[in-house]
Design a protein with these regions (language model features):
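Periplasmic/extracellular loop-to-transmembrane helix junction in inner-membrane transport proteins
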Residues: 28-71
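C-terminal transmembrane helix and the adjacent membrane-cytosol boundary/short C-terminal tail
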Residues: 88, 145, 176, 180-183, ...
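Short cytoplasmic-facing helical segments at TM-TM junctions of multi-pass membrane proteins
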Residues: 139, 143-178
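Transmembrane-helix boundary motif in ABC transporter permease subunits
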Residues: 68-98
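Glycine-rich helix-loop "coupling/hinge" segments at transmembrane-helix boundaries
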Residues: 115-116, 192-228, 254
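N-terminal signal-anchor/first transmembrane alpha helix
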Residues: 1-26
Length: 254
């Protein structure tokens, strides 16, 4: 317990030091105060946004978009990855296209998506779904292809059909790979959601709020949004890490 508290204390040292340096530069001159907004002003803006509901409204919009894109990308990724891993014809037909397309940076699709679908909510959700789809499909494929031979022989002994073999043999043994892919996909979804809001500034969202604050020279609001995005991302990473640790322990036990 004591070692954990010491570890937490050391972990807080860097943020405190950065806050001290930030405050130091903000008080050097007016020019520095514009770029490095005093911590007191940032704190005041946080309570202002929290009090009038703007922070909650935009945060919920970003979380909702991330969750929708995560759900769609996960389902499609598992479906495509499983198809390539199980059906050789699907691997031959889909595999080359998938591996070629995933080499294109996500930002490279922005002009095409904007041209085809405009700059609305659908385009933002599509970007998030694409960011999630790639790691989910790859890890599902790798998980199914790396199932050990003894497990496959069990399916042959029981004369499982293709669906039974997938449900009772391949999928249970591929879950660690799939969960690792989901951990990565969750981080990608959050980053892609905020990025899409910055690129397609339509509707509420933390990214849109940052752009509005930037145009109004409200650097304090921009910093509040950045810190909020970082904290939510850390909480997601912490939560999925705990779930992954529990899940892998349960999976090994069963």
């Amino acid at each position: 317990m004591r070692s954990r508290l010491i570890s937490w204390a050391w972990g807080l040292l860097t943020p405190v030091l950065l806050a001290f340096l930030w405050e130091f530069f903000s008080r050097r001159s007016i020019a520095h105060a514009y770029a490095f907004v005093p911590v007191a002003d940032i704190w005041r803006s946080f309570w202002e946004l929290a009090g009038n509901g703007d922070l909650a409204l935009n945060l919920w919009a970003t979380l909702r978009s991330a969750l929708l894109g995560l759900s769609i990308g996960t389902l499609l990724g598992i479906s495509v990855g499983a198809s390539m891993g199980i059906i050789k014809t699907a691997d031959v037909l889909i595999g080359p296209i998938y591996h070629m397309v995933r080499q294109v940076p996500l930002l490279g699709w922005i002009p095409l998506i904007g041209l085809w679908f405009g700059t609305g909510v659908f385009s933002k959700n599509l970007i998030v779904a694409m960011a999630v789809f790639y790691p989910m499909a790859l890890h599902t494929y790798e998980g199914i292809r790396n199932v050990e031979k003894p497990y496959l022989e069990v399916g042959e002994i029981f004369r499982f059909g293709r669906w039974q073999r997938f449900v009772h043999v391949l999928l249970p043994n591929a879950w660690p790979y799939i969960f690792t892919g989901f951990s990565n996909a969750l981080a990608f979804a959050w980053v892609a959601t905020v990025g899409s809001e910055l690129l397609f500034a339509t509707g509420p969202g933390l990214g849109a709020l940052m752009l509005i604050a930037q145009s109004a020279s409200r650097m304090d609001v921009v910093i509040v949004c950045i810190v909020t995005i970082g904290i939510i991302g850390c909480l997601m990473n912490f939560g999925i890490g705990k779930i992954r640790k529990w899940f892998l322990g349960w999976h090994c036990a069963h």
